[in-house]
Amino acid sequence: MPFSNSHNALKLRFPAEDEFPDLSAHNNHMAKVLTPELYAELRAKSTPSGFTLDDVIQTGVDNPGHPYIMTVGCVAGDEESYEVFKDLFDPIIEDRHGGYKPSDEHKTDLNPDNLQGGDDLDPNYVLSSRVRTGRSIRGFCLPPHCSRGERRAIEKLAVEALSSLDGDLAGRYYALKSMTEAEQQQLIDDHFLFDKPVSPLLLASGMARDWPDARGIWHNDNKTFLVWVNEEDHLRVISMQKGGNMKEVFTRFCTGLTQIETLFKSKDYEFMWNPHLGYILTCPSNLGTGLRAGVHIKLPNLGKHEKFSEVLKRLRLQKRGTGGVDTAAVGGVFDVSNADRLGFSEVELVQMVVDGVKLLIEMEQRLEQGQAIDDLMPAQK
């Protein structure tokens, strides 16, 4: 756990090979990259806030793999982690983000007018649409490493900023610790609130310390715009609604996000960002846009088809179970979203989802009629 690692200097009394973790049964990005040599080279380093190599990798040591997705196996504890431990992070980022090089520059586009179509995904197949991202506030440690005081300060800042939103974004903040068990569970079941911190990835990285202190959810009155505070990231911004109007969801997302950033700037706070990695977040898998645009989509036939995984791969999409990352699909309903985060703009990623989902629906309709889908197979994007 972070904070117990203040004895990093004491560990250096042991040779690096005595401290090197056993990764022999591991299947995550960190385990693929971390060698005894790299460990020896980086283990004495720490960021200005005291985050060490062992803090970075602990979650990946404790969690060898995941049944549904290839996990990253490491986290950042502050903005400087990506620089101080770049010899570990850079190859992981390149591996996870489709060959994204240390010299590459990220691009941002939060103008919803640049999205082509997206307002007409068939609601007979698309049950709901959602776009989310994360944001980190510069000057604070990230959740694996932040103190109670930092976390409470982030919550206070977030609540002040969010309470200034108006129009259809106006809403209120609900602190986790003042919710009843039933209220919390209802919000989780409705997919509005993050789960209780039972995920081993959250626990092993130290993100669940002091739970539920200074955690909460802010949402507008009709629950189409939500902000999670102090879960895996300082802020998770989510726009969602029933049906297939991804254009509307994305427009609300861009408007709300831009307003939130402006409100933080008015208090002299900015979000962590740099030209190479885009928006800096706790998990390297979310760097860049941090954006996941997803739909819950009914594909009872295509979902069982042998080519389903190949189709998704070619469209640069990924599937999750109905209840999210740790679950299986129920009743032929899948959570389908963009696989990329970094190296593409927000508009490009949402466009991939919109175009890809249209094709998935066309394939599903063919299969309903007992027809072949070979001629619809997409080229690799």
UniProtKB/Swiss-Prot annotation:
There is a cross-link at K45, K101, K107, K381 (Glycyl lysine isopeptide (Lys-Gly) (interchain with G-Cter in ubiquitin)). Residues 11-98 form the Phosphagen kinase N-terminal domain. It is an enzyme of class 2 (transferase). Residues 96-122 are annotated as: Disordered. GO terms for cellular component: cytosol; extracellular exosome; extracellular space; mitochondrion; plasma membrane. It holds the Pfam family ATP-gua_PtransN. The modification Phosphoserine is found at S4, S199, S309. Its main location: cytoplasm. Residues 130-138 are annotated as: Internal MTS-like signal. Ubiquitinated by the ECS(ASB9) complex, leading to its degradation by the proteasome. This is Creatine kinase B-type.
